[in-house]
């Protein structure tokens, strides 16, 4: 079947998530945000990484607003601070200026005093294009999150949580040796838990 090719899977699921109309997309983003706060998954954590939504991903802004209101330290990934394809994280405040990186994704301008490595995070919300019944995710193809998730797999220094629409579930993601399964993926309708 054609859906076994990772590039085809990416195109298919990116197109699928982009088809969700804006009104429903907004409701689903609020639903996920409420679900995260309702389940107490954020108890005893301080530093939370999240992503700026891009290319039809679930809108993280309602969650970011709630995190700020609850006084969590919110961090966004940054890839322009070096060229090693490793993500770092910058503190994100309501007045933080964002610029588009080379992939057209919004990120903060590098500032050493607001920069942390993934080891200093408690939770990392992870974007994905698709996911399967075992927690494996298909990303956009750059490998940035794959390299960070290896740190989770080895050190368990932060807890990664995938955020997705329900339509991004796939029964047949083509897994590669570098892929790391997420322990939790949250969709508007379901908590997928593998821990």
UniProtKB/Swiss-Prot annotation:
<protein>
    <recommendedName>
        <fullName>Uncharacterized protein bbp_370</fullName>
    </recommendedName>
</protein>
<feature type="binding site">
    <location>
        <begin position="139"/>
        <end position="146"/>
    </location>
    <ligand>
        <name>ATP</name>
    </ligand>
</feature>
<dbReference type="Pfam" id="PF01812">
    <property type="entry name" value="5-FTHF_cyc-lig"/>
</dbReference>
<dbReference type="GO" id="GO:0030272">
    <property type="term" value="F:5-formyltetrahydrofolate cyclo-ligase activity"/>
</dbReference>
<keyword id="KW-0547">Nucleotide-binding</keyword>
<dbReference type="InterPro" id="IPR024185">
    <property type="entry name" value="FTHF_cligase-like_sf"/>
</dbReference>
<dbReference type="GO" id="GO:0009396">
    <property type="term" value="P:folic acid-containing compound biosynthetic process"/>
</dbReference>
<dbReference type="GO" id="GO:0035999">
    <property type="term" value="P:tetrahydrofolate interconversion"/>
</dbReference>
<feature type="binding site">
    <location>
        <position position="179"/>
    </location>
    <ligand>
        <name>ATP</name>
    </ligand>
</feature>
<dbReference type="InterPro" id="IPR002698">
    <property type="entry name" value="FTHF_cligase"/>
</dbReference>
<feature type="binding site">
    <location>
        <begin position="6"/>
        <end position="10"/>
    </location>
    <ligand>
        <name>ATP</name>
    </ligand>
</feature>
<comment type="similarity">
    <text>Belongs to the 5-formyltetrahydrofolate cyclo-ligase family.</text>
</comment>
<dbReference type="GO" id="GO:0005524">
    <property type="term" value="F:ATP binding"/>
</dbReference>
<dbReference type="InterPro" id="IPR037171">
    <property type="entry name" value="NagB/RpiA_transferase-like"/>
</dbReference>
<keyword id="KW-0067">ATP-binding</keyword>
